[in-house]
Amino acid sequence: MADPSSQNPNLATPPPPSSPSPTHQIQSGTSELSPPSRPPCSTLSFLKTANRPKLRVTSEFDSDSLLFLNKVSCKLFDNLAKLKLSFQNNSQREISQPQVSFTSKHVSVLYDVEEKNTFIKSTLDVHPRLQLRALHNVKAQQGEVAMEANLTEPGYSLELSSPVPIGYPRATLKFPLGEISLQEKDEEEEEKQKRTLSVNGILKRQVMNGVCTALYTDEELRLRYAYKDDALSFIPSISLPSNAASFAFKRRFSPSDKLSYWYNFDSNMWSAVYKRTYGKDYKLKAGYDSDVRLGWASLWVGDEAGKVKTTPMKMKVQFMLQVPQDDIKSSVLMFRVKKRWDI
């Protein structure tokens, strides 16, 4: 916000005093001239120069659900904290899901007005290599505490966490190639409760021109290889022991044209998407999904992946046409608009 004094010099400096007559100078002798009277400060200039936080108002409308998603936020204490109010309202102006949140570097508080519940998250760096974290659900009286220590080797850390008030602790070792977690859990076996050790982890490694990933969770292993260059991406994956396999294929024909295809060998389901961009702020997408037997096309005005504040007029618009394969007459045209105001 511009300072009013820079727009009108008369508000910044008082008018110069009128030159005294020679007679007055002789009579006053060595006495000082009285300072000029200060012009009265108007209420309007005071309001303009008041240091209030700037409000950011964002509203998004979805024609499919006929709902407005509204957010009002401002930064406090020289951008050290953020206060945000979010809520939804329908065409009858009925407000639902109101939430108020306060976020700072070390403490975050989210209050759900309808549920009358508060979620608290805190982070504290007690040492350059030691961090404490805590999560708490006030209504459920449940949470989690965690401690993460960075080891001497770069990229290595050890995290210990435990549910509150009861639960088995979990230990996670993080390293440059992935992470491994260990946690005890109870299993029922022949009407008896048995305690077992659960192992989850993920490993990533560069192989040739791609990345090989192994994800193990809940006694299921998923292997995935992602090859990517400037024009081609090929991503096969398989899950064990179910042997469910799939692959994704992406081909870039030019900087503005791209085709993506996905196929699942287990279910014979597939989907395809063609994308074309026109500059930075226009994107056309068309595709088909065999799982729901639906063809669709969408037009984005404004950067789809970017923030609304970087788009022209701080607004993004999406138009989408959905055409069911089994009933073309029931095709529907939808749109979504997102706009931001800085007050």
Swiss-Prot record:
Disulfide feature: none
Bilayer topology term: Multi-pass membrane protein
Location of the protein in the cell: Plastid, Chloroplast outer membrane
Tissue: Ubiquitously expressed at low levels. Mostly present in cotyledons, and accumulates in seedlings and embryos.
A GO molecular-function descriptor: porin activity
Keywords, comma-separated and alphabetical: Chloroplast, Ion transport, Membrane, Plastid, Plastid outer membrane, Porin, Transit peptide, Transmembrane, Transmembrane beta strand, Transport
One Gene Ontology term, aspect cellular component: cytosol
Chloroplast intermembrane side: 87-103, 138-154, 179-219, 241, 268-269, 297-316
Sequence ranges of Polar residues compositional bias: 1-11, 23-43
Annotated spans, Disordered: 1-43
Cytoplasmic side: 74-76, 114-129, 165-169, 229-230, 251-257, 280-286, 327-343
Similarity-based family: Belongs to the plastid outer envelope porin OEP37 (TC 1.B.47) family.
Protein name, entry field: Outer envelope pore protein 37, chloroplastic
